[in-house]
Each structure stands twice: as structure tokens, then as C-alpha cells.
């Protein structure tokens, strides 16, 4: 269910990337582009956290903002966290 929701939420981003973005001049100051970042963030972190990361990225992407390499942060799932003690 969760994966399907992520795919559904990423679909409009993919439509933008394939249909709208090619006819517009390049404008994103970051790599990966904001749309690629948003799609990866939603697929990696889920709809809520990934959407929040995408919104924060879009807010930073303006002429007076930063630029350069800005990857999606790694997932913070509990299974990625090592145990506190080695029993």
C-alpha cells in the first residue's frame, strides 16, 4: 500500500519531467534537478517526509539561493540504526 501511494504521488512529477520540462529552459540551480530530487525523496522517505523535503528544496531554488550538488538525505529507518548495546 505504501509503495503504491508513493508511485501515485510521483506520477505527476514524472509527467512534468517528460512533457513540460523539455520545452522549458533549464532553470534549476541544483543537481539533481528539483523534480528528480522530489521524486527520489518521496520514493526514499515516503509521501509526508519526502514531500516536506521536496518543498524545502523548492523553497531554496531561487536566484539568491544556493546551488550545486544537493542529494536526498539517506533514509533514517529504525533498521538502519545500530543497536545501543552489543549483548
From Swiss-Prot:
A cellular component term, taken from the record's GO annotations: plasma membrane
Location in the cell: Cell inner membrane
Membrane topology according to the record: Peripheral membrane protein
Xref: PANTHER family: MEMBRANE PROTEIN INSERTION EFFICIENCY FACTOR-RELATED
Protein name (record): Putative membrane protein insertion efficiency factor
Organism (species): Desulfovibrio desulfuricans (strain ATCC 27774 / DSM 6949 / MB)
Region called Disordered, residue ranges: 64-87
Coarse class of the protein's main subcellular location: membrane
Family to which the UniProt record says this protein belongs: Belongs to the UPF0161 family.
